[in-house]
From Swiss-Prot:
The family this protein is said to belong to: Belongs to the UPF0260 family.
Protein name: UPF0260 protein Tgr7_0887
Domain of life of the native organism: Bacteria
InterPro entries associated with the record: Puta_zinc/iron-chelating_dom, UCP006173
NCBIfam families: PRK05170.1-5, PRK05170.2-5
Amino acid sequence: MSQGSAPFWETTPLAQMSQAQWESLCDGCGRCCLHKLEDEDTGEIYHTAVACRLLDLETCRCSDYAHRKQRVPDCIQLTPADIPAFHWLPPSCAYRRVAEGRGLAPWHPLVSGDPDSVHRAGVSVRGRVVSEDEGDPLETRIVVWPGRDV
């Protein structure tokens, strides 16, 4: 970014971003990789502290990103076409923030220049979740914090 020019997330609509720009918006918090439950009657989404088995609980990144859809068929791959449905993403999510015109948070790696800032700010799931491989019933692991803005 040259001095005086606005960053791409402030000038380029989500639907017009390059693949590299789109991917770089992910802050690496891991919240979208947590299992969620939906109330059949109200449609309300409940977050759990149970992560997809492919989520590396230390780095908060997918351990097999290139093949995640083959290994986890119900993995949700975010694309610009999904923008109208971003309401299920945590309010802190960069995709949702940009879609809502709120810009990136100060702790976002694109703003801070530090990929670990998301962890230091307490936004990531690091140290707060278990893998689905532990076998706990999701209903026993419902938590509120992933759905809160930070």
